[in-house]
């Protein structure tokens, strides 16, 4: 009987040792898993923030491009409309063609003149 008791006691010690080692291994594995998850979460957050910033920047660029295209299109339509109204007025005899020959400065010409004035004022010290 003593042999059995001693054998079971040794086996019990082995099981207890294995359980302790298993518990320690599981704890270490849990810590490493937590570290890994936190690392992935942090990197994912950085990537999301960077992606959102990138998308916002591209959206802003596209909005600017669209607005420039719209302004250009509106200017073109306005110019063509004025030309057609002038043609109709001349054709119907309401206005003489010579009366329409007065050149109207374009917005670009006016902007260039304004820039030149600012440059001259800057050179002269604002006097």
From Swiss-Prot:
GO terms for molecular function: cuprous ion binding. The keyword Phosphoprotein applies. Residues 99-127 are annotated as: Disordered. The modification Phosphoserine is found at residues 67, 72, 124. One of its GO terms (cellular component) is axon terminus. The keyword Transcription regulation does not apply. Residues 20-67 are annotated as: 4 X 11 AA tandem repeats of [EGSA]-K-T-K-[EQ]-[GQ]-V-X(4). Residues 110-127 have a biased composition (Basic and acidic residues). Its main location: cytoplasm. It is found in: Cytoplasm, Perinuclear region; Cytoplasm, Cytoskeleton, Microtubule organizing center, Centrosome; Cytoplasm, Cytoskeleton, Spindle. Keywords: Cytoplasm, Cytoskeleton, Phosphoprotein, Repeat. Phosphorylated by BARK1 and GRK5. Gene3D superfamilies: Helix hairpin bin. Predominantly expressed in retina (predominantly in outer nuclear layer, also in inner segment of photoreceptor cells, some individual cells located in the inner nuclear layer, inner plexiform layer and in nerve fiber layer). Also found in brain and heart. It comes from the Eukaryota. One of its GO terms (biological process) is adult locomotory behavior. Pfam families: Synuclein. Sequence repeats lie at residues 20-30, 31-41, 42-56, 57-67. Plays a role in neurofilament network integrity. May be involved in modulating axonal architecture during development and in the adult. In vitro, increases the susceptibility of neurofilament-H to calcium-dependent proteases. May also function in modulating the keratin network in skin. Activates the MAPK and Elk-1 signal transduction pathway. PANTHER family: GAMMA-SYNUCLEIN, SYNUCLEIN. Belongs to the synuclein family. May be a centrosome-associated protein. Interacts with MYOC; affects its secretion and its aggregation. This is Gamma-synuclein. It comes from Bos taurus.
